[in-house]
Amino acid sequence: MNSVTLGIDLGKRWFHVVGCDAAGKVVLREKLGRNQLLQLMAQHPPCLVGIETCCGSQYLARKFQGFGHDVKLLPAQYVKPFVKSQKNDFNDAQAITEAVRLPTMRFVPLKSEEQMDVQALHRARERMLQQRLALTNQIRGLLLDRGIEIAQGFYALRTVLPALLEKEDSGLTPMMRDLGRMLLDMWNRTETTIEQMNDRLKCLSRESDLCRRLQTIPGVGVLLSTAIVSAVGNASTFRRARDLAAWVGLVPQQHTTGGKPRLLGITKRGNSYLRRLFVQGARALWVWKDKHPNDPIQHWLIQLAERRHAHIAVCALANKLVRIAWAVMRSGAEFNLNYRTGIAADR
């Protein structure tokens, strides 16, 4: 492995590369296009390469790994303190070379193409959900301007609106009926796309042994299991379960001064989409907590609910689900409700 460390500041068309030797002296300083960068990395002796996480960083990291380099992805907020003087692309690249060599630096795990595919499907589905909600609100708002009220929910829109648009005495002008048909057609196509994406995620979860094992955890279904796998893989980058819980942002924020610890609300750091799914799964268990009081998790939740607010109890349960998911991923076993020793959610 070469002693030179490369820091690359990524862009859409231009990439700024700074190389430093073991003493920290700059030995390379280049502004390159995409093809030129790939040629440089293919010809350069294997070395440590630092890249800030951004759009396209995962792809380039996999390419550079294929050339034999040791590639590390750094969160942008961890690089910023190393930027000296004015902010420009070369200074950013040099800051990356300094940050990547720190032994205590925290890196972003590299994702496989399969993980990126599942993550892209989740993001596209989330976009379609937002689009469906926006269309629903717009249709209801336009009709309310004409004195027509439709109940909330997708079912009412799906069943009431088609008949309303066909009625001659509905109070809608011909132009409004035509516009309503156009918006309803867009809504139906969006709904069909969401169903197709859901079917694809179900198929992926059935094909993945890890997803099937994760779904043995109470509160974890198709969406959450596939989202976990796409985000963290087999969780090998997390040494302990609490590290994964902290990465998801489901641990209390700590503010300690003068030796007096003080815990605040959850940090809400990391993957907000994954955190939301864990909280939704915890809320599903919260609804059924009184139905199965002998269940160990439900029994623990009932006892916690007697001492804490419902929202706090739900977040605590979501934290527990994250830890259980880590144990299932690292152990290679399914979740066993009555297994209290051995692989614990946190050691």
Task: Give the predicted meaning of each segment.
Residues 1-347:
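A detector of single, family-specific signature residues
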